[in-house]
């Protein structure tokens, strides 16, 4: 497509901006091959190709490439249904959380109901696991969501048939039914993963408990 000069103030395309967006789309659509070429300057030709068979796992690995990881491979969970959900998670030794959310490949930088469902689900799963395995004792308080998300890098991608966007920039998902769908999916799929991978669960919970103690 070509931009309409009667609408846009500038018609100059920025290669780096387009490159970043196409890389993002390739991460979100496993196996999709995208090529971008800049042929405007014969002396400075640019070309990038993107194809990620790992999908969201590759996205998280890209985001964490310069960070020290607590567990070697991202945790990947997915479920089809009314609202298909894909999530990849990996913990690092960092103190901040980095969660990226997408709806139909649109970057919802303000979050929304899919992010809320994820936060509720992951808080429940890790607290339930810690209680069941006596990592949290009866006298201990539950871990807060912020403790559980410290050091987390996550990418959440959902497909919604009729998305409702809110916020000043329309980058916040407002569909109320998505909260429960994502929360239930996280509980249903992540809980068995932790049971089957106790070393990963233990490493993550050590990080969460350390964050909780530091906060107190």
Features from the language model and the residues they span:
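GHKL-family ATPase ATP-binding module
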Residues: 1-216
